[in-house]
Amino acid sequence: VPDLRTFRPGGARVVAYAVGVIMLVITVVIGLALPDDISFTVAEDITLWLIIIAVLVFLHGIGRSFVRADDDGVEVLNGYRHHRIPWSDIQGFAMGSGAPWPTLVTNDDERVMLFAIQGSDGGYAREAVAYLRSRVPS
């Protein structure tokens, strides 16, 4: 049985999607509550919806982030950027006290931030980093 673990942000994911829903609801409620004599031009409507869509795309990027460790290596999705790093290329994982997220360090001294593991998630983040460190070949 292959050893596969996936880590996703806890609180940040909930906050990202909740903010997206709240933003949409407030926009619709305000739009419906405006008096009839107040209306937006087409350009204003387009600008408003483009800004809302941009914010929703950003929030979805936070929510969809993950770190997946399997027998071959680590797969990282930070927002819309994807990395696949084999275990043989990984030197270790660093997460200092108070750090917002851990960092994967490669043998070439490249660094990949692991946004899916949020330091604010406390024990979950410490457990995830301990697991990832245990998988690095000696």
Label for each model-derived stretch:
Residues 53-85:
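Conserved beta-hairpin
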Residues 14, 88-89, 116-121:
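A short, sequence-level motif marking secondary-structure junctions
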Residues 106-138:
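A membrane-cytosol interface segment of integral membrane proteins
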Residues 1-40:
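N-terminal membrane-targeting/pre-transmembrane regions
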Residues 40-51:
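Hydrophobic alpha-helical transmembrane segments
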Residues 74, 83-98:
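Phosphoinositide-dependent membrane-docking surfaces
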Residues 100-103:
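Short aromatic-glycine-enriched beta-strand elements
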